[in-house]
A protein has these predicted regions:
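Charged, terminal alpha-helix-loop-beta segments
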Residues: 1-204
């Protein structure tokens, strides 16, 4: 009878990547590893072209973890990737909104060990609100192995755009003249100010 191995999850990803900025982000920025992420979010293995790591946000002292371009998507088809170890937090949620706005990214990918329910809900809401091609993804990173094999990464997509729902609700979100309704505009303004507030308090 054939002996089979057993999949085992590596609970501490820091045993493989000691730090998010020093180890995980440089690892992910390599073409082979970006191909894994690109496939997970549905762009295909050659769907992302790496443009830079620690990309400065114009007019500020902040840097986005990774900036890519969707292959074949044109000059403005930018993809922002923000990484976080541990559980997602309000600070990183504010960062991705600020970075996406400053860099004019159409696609935003938040990667963490655990994406909290309230942050999933916020990104789902943004996907439902967006009518200009902007897309938000949230991904939980895991490591697995079989016996003594090399660790293997797994990207679990927990938030992704629902294009069918977006098309169905687009008319409801917009007023007759094509602009956001006052209620939707108020919510969008709130999240924008929330991100700006988090940035202003950083380093205090």
């Amino acid at each position: 009878m054939t002996t089979l191995g057993r999949l085992e999850r590596i609970d501490r990803i820091r045993s493989i990547w000691p730090g998010e900025e020093s180890a995980f982000t440089p690892w992910l920025a390599k073409d082979d590893n970006l191909a894994l992420l690109s496939s997970a979010i549905g762009f295909g293995p050659e769907g992302l072209e790496h443009l830079g790591t620690e990309v400065p946000l114009p007019g500020s002292g902040y840097h986005a973890d990774i900036l890519c371009r969707e292959t074949g998507g044109g000059e403005d088809a930018l993809v922002l990737i923000e990484n976080q170890f541990g559980k997602s937090d309000h600070s990183h949620l504010g960062k991705i909104l600020t970075y996406a706005s400053g860099l004019k990214a159409k696609t935003v990918v938040l990667i963490g060990e655990t994406i909290r329910a309230e942050h999933r809900a916020a990104l789902d809401w943004l996907n439902g609100l967006s009518t200009d091609g902007c897309r938000f993804f949230a991904i939980e990173i895991e490591l697995w192995r079989i016996g003594d094999s090399l660790p293997a990464p797994r990207f679990n997509v927990v938030v992704e755009p629902n294009d069918w729902a977006r098309r169905a609700t687009e008319a409801r979100i917009l007023s007759e003249d094509g602009n956001l309704t006052p209620a939707r505009q108020m919510l969008l303004d709130y999240w924008t100010r929330f991100g700006e507030l988090l940035d202003s308090r950083k380093g205090r």
